Amino acid sequence: MANTETTINAVINPQLNDTPIDIEKTIKALERNKFVVNYFETGVEAVDYLQSRIQDKSVAIGDSRTLMELKVHDALSEVNKDITDIQRPLPGESFRDTALRTMGREVFLTSVNALAQTGEMVNIDGTGNRVAASRFGSQEVFFVLGRNKITPDLASAIYRARNVAAPLNSKKNKKSSLNPCAKLEEKCYDCGSPDRICNALTIYYKKMRNMQTMEVIIINEDLGF
């Protein structure tokens, strides 16, 4: 694990833009909540670690711009034969069937929309498959995120998920790109759109019971939304 005595800035909201984020404090808070934590200066180091850590397992990868940017699928494919990726369905396979295959794998990887310096993580979902797989079914879950996801506290983490991550995620999808948060100012309008991507908000307070490991990988780079 790289040196954690680092202070970085995270984009949260206009009022908190200049709030310094203490990585060491964040790691200690996560560890108090029974999460395993590893910190890396670069994405390359983090992917090398994941490749050495996850071998000969049944693996599922949730929808995550961070994991796509890091090319985690390609790296893990070199050392694991059984990989289900929500972004890579089998020919003719429905989204639902692909999502169901991500459940119950030995290992599940995803990211988070926000990580509070106080040790909680936040994810927001439209369909719910990502947060479902991250909370139950796998023996080990890895949350991989960049420094830009870190916020001072839980309230600002929820703010970030709703007003920063959700609008950016809406823009990347053809249907959800018509949502107000994607077309207008980037913020939550609490809309009633059928293609709304923020129907459920999950707060990870502590490691789930009966799960072997919930590990948080923090990278000192801006990654994902």
Task: Please provide the spans of the model-predicted regions.
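N-terminal active-site beta-alpha-beta segment that forms phosphate/nucleotide-binding
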Residues: 19, 23-99, 104-109
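Conserved phosphate- and dinucleotide-binding cores of soluble alpha/beta proteins
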Residues: 103-225
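Short, mixed-charge, low-aromatic patches
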Residues: 1-7, 30, 89, 109-118
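A near-ubiquitous, low-amplitude feature marking generic local secondary-structure context
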Residues: 6-9, 13, 29, 33, ...
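Short linear motifs at secondary-structure transitions and domain/linker junctions
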Residues: 11-15, 34-37, 82-90, 97-100, ...
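Short N-terminal helix-initiation segments at or just after the protein's N-terminus
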Residues: 2-5, 84-91, 221-223
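Iron-sulfur (Fe-S) cluster-binding modules
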Residues: 1-33, 49, 54, 168-178
